[in-house]
Structures are given as structure tokens and as C-alpha cells.
Amino acid sequence: IVCGGRSDAATRFIEPTLMDEVPLDSPLMTEEIFGPVFPMITLDDEGNSFKDKVIEFVTNREKPLAFYYFGKEAEGWEIIRRTSSGGGCINDVIMHIANENVPFGGVGNSGMGMYHDKESFEAFSHRRSIIATGTWIDLPFRYMPYKMFGLVKKIL
């Protein structure tokens, strides 16, 4: 634990907590986190470019609900373009959730759909496609046997 870590079950309080050197097979890295606990991943910059290591790290795992990148902004944008996540920030955390005008949601195993503002309404709505056909004429080529199919193909 780098900082934080205090909790109080009676008041349901969990202090925002930063954790470093978390094993990649730890539940903190393999399960969704519903609390102010942030595992940090540090990648060395030897060998392949750092940006490529980040992209490889992200794309070799399940798509994250959120992706937070700290580093050069231009590299951050390239990494975001080449990876997939629900949302994210460059050189910040949480702000994509805090803004009610910015949709938030997951992709892949971290969920489907977005919420906040109009997206909340859409997420809990069901849009149906309905086709209404008039009864004044019922074209026989819709039904078997399809004898008139050749004629329809010629017309089209």
C-alpha cells in the first residue's frame, strides 16, 4: 500500500488507496473493483518502446472498465486509440465518471452500454423496430411456392 488503506466497517468507509507491485493474478487485477482502491502497474522502459509495452499489457487482458494513463499526453492518446476500454483519463483519474455530461460505461466483460445524461435514458429504454404493412394488397410472391421469384428478379 503506497497510501491510504484505512477502513471502518461500521461507517462503511474505505479510504482511497493506492497499491503498487500488485501481482497480475491478484483479484485486484482480475476482478472489477467497486471501491476507491487503485492498483498501479509500473512498466520498465527498456527494450520495446514504453508505449508499445503499455499497449501489449492492455490488449493481452480483458478490456478494462476504465483506463488511466500517466505520462506524455501524445503517447496517452495513441495508446487510447490502439486499445479498448470503457472510458479513461490521461494524467488524471475518475474525472470521466464525475462529469455527468460525459457518458460512462464498459465494453466486453466490463459491461455494455453507457450511462449519464441521455445515455442513462437510452440504457434503460428499449427501442423496437416495427414494420406496418397495409392490407389493401397482399402480393403473392411473398408466399411459397415462389413461382414469381424469377419475374421479381427481372423487375429488380
Cite the ranges covered by each PLM segment.
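Short, solvent-exposed loop/turn elements at beta->coil junctions and helix N-caps
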Residues: 4-9, 93-94
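Conserved C-terminal structural/oligomerization subdomain of aldehyde/semialdehyde dehydrogenase
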Residues: 14-156
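Short beta-strand segments
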Residues: 1-5, 68-69
